[in-house]
């Protein structure tokens, strides 16, 4: 698979006299079409890392390559057009008086012709299942709907990469599921590369790979199965465990012989049913 993002020994400090860097010797590669989750407790450097990928921050040292282009002041705007970001608070992202006006805002800034703009807005709203709300005021939407509109605004720009920077952290479980299912659908249809910056372990379970940050350093990377199987280590890093792992731990304490490998909620349900039927 062709790499779309490459980071090599990235270092960054917010202030020159900071004793601890926000990022320290971070290196990894993301392939085109992958879904990557970056997890870590507050202050681990995960959001700083996201901002170096799209050029909001330029690293003090190291190399960032996006789409085979090295991030520097000369091509920073080209790279930013390749990367769309959805932030934590949807209310801080709206500038239009209606949903369709808001989705069109970024297109207007890029000078997209009106005829093409109308097509892109309609297409983006259909992809996030919000077409029927096109003339609605954003303030009258639920949290999950607002984030879906924010995603539509990014999708309309047709980036190669979408970064979700704690995009579900302020939503209730229903809104969170709305956003995750929307991203899954768009990724499958458009072969987008998705980077999810999150502390929500259940959200991270949707990724192809997970990167674990601690105090500015990349300390682990692997598939959800590989990462979540190291339960005690995650707890030591200040992270939670996915629900299936918590359930397995509780069953084990009651003397139930449980599988050692990580299981999704769906696989856990199947295993429980099989265990009951085989008794």
Swiss-Prot record:
Q: Which residues form the signal peptide?
A: none
Q: Which residues form the ABC transporter domain?
A: 5-240
Q: Which organism is it from?
A: Enterococcus faecium
Q: Which SMART domains match?
A: AAA
**Subunit annotation:** Forms a stable energy-coupling factor (ECF) transporter complex composed of 2 membrane-embedded substrate-binding proteins (S component), 2 ATP-binding proteins (A component) and 2 transmembrane proteins (T component).
Name any one GO molecular function: ATPase-coupled transmembrane transporter activity
Q: In what way does this protein cross or attach to the membrane? A: Peripheral membrane protein
Q: CDD domains recorded for this chain?
A: ABC_cobalt_CbiO_domain1 (cd03225)
Using the UniProt record, name the top-level EC class of this enzyme in a single word: translocase
PANTHER family on file: ENERGY-COUPLING FACTOR TRANSPORTER ATP-BINDING PROTEIN ECFA1, HEAVY METAL TRANSPORTER
- Homology family: Belongs to the ABC transporter superfamily. Energy-coupling factor EcfA family.
SUPFAM superfamilies cross-referenced by the UniProt entry? P-loop containing nucleoside triphosphate hydrolases (SSF52540)
Q: Which gene encodes it?
A: ecfA
Q: Known EC number(s)? A: 7.-.-.-
User: What's any one GO cellular component for it?
Assistant: ATP-binding cassette (ABC) transporter complex
Enumerate the subcellular locations listed in this protein's record, separating them with semicolons.
Cell membrane
| Protein task | ATP-binding (A) component of a common energy-coupling factor (ECF) ABC-transporter complex. Unlike classic ABC transporters this ECF transporter provides the energy necessary to transport a number of different substrates.
Task: Give the protein name, as stated in the record.
Answer: Energy-coupling factor transporter ATP-binding protein EcfA
């Amino acid at each position: 698979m062709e790499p779309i993002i490459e980071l090599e020994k990235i270092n960054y400090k917010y202030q020159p006299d900071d004793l601890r860097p926000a990022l320290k010797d971070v290196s990894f590669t993301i392939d085109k079409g992958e879904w990557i989750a970056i997890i870590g407790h507050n202050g681990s450097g995960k959001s700083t890392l996201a901002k170096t990928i799209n050029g909001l921050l330029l690293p003090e040292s190291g190399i960032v390559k996006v789409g085979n282009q090295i991030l520097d002041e000369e091509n920073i705007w080209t790279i930013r057009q390749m990367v769309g970001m959805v932030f934590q608070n949807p209310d801080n992202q709206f500038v239009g008086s209606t949903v369709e006006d808001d989705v069109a805002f970024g297109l207007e800034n890029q000078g997209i012709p009106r005829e093409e703009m109308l097509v892109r807005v309609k297409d983006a709203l259909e992809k996030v299942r919000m077409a029927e709300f096109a003339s609605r005021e954003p303030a009258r939407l639920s949290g999950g709907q607002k984030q879906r509109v924010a995603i539509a605004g990014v999708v309309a720009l047709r980036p190669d990469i979408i970064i979700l920077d704690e995009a579900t952290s302020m939503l209730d479980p229903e809104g969170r599921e709305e956003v995750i299912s929307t991203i899954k659908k768009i990724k499958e249809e458009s072969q987008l590369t998705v980077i999810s910056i999150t502390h929500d372990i259940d959200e991270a379970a949707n990724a192809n790979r997970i990167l674990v940050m601690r105090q500015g350093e990349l300390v682990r990377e692997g598939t959800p199965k590989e990462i979540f199987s190291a339960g005690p280590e995650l707890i030591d890093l200040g992270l939670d465990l996915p629900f299936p792992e918590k359930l397995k731990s509780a069953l084990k304490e009651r003397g139930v012989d449980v599988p050692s490998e990580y299981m999704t909620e769906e696989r856990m349900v199947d295993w429980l049913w099989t265990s009951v039927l085989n008794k």
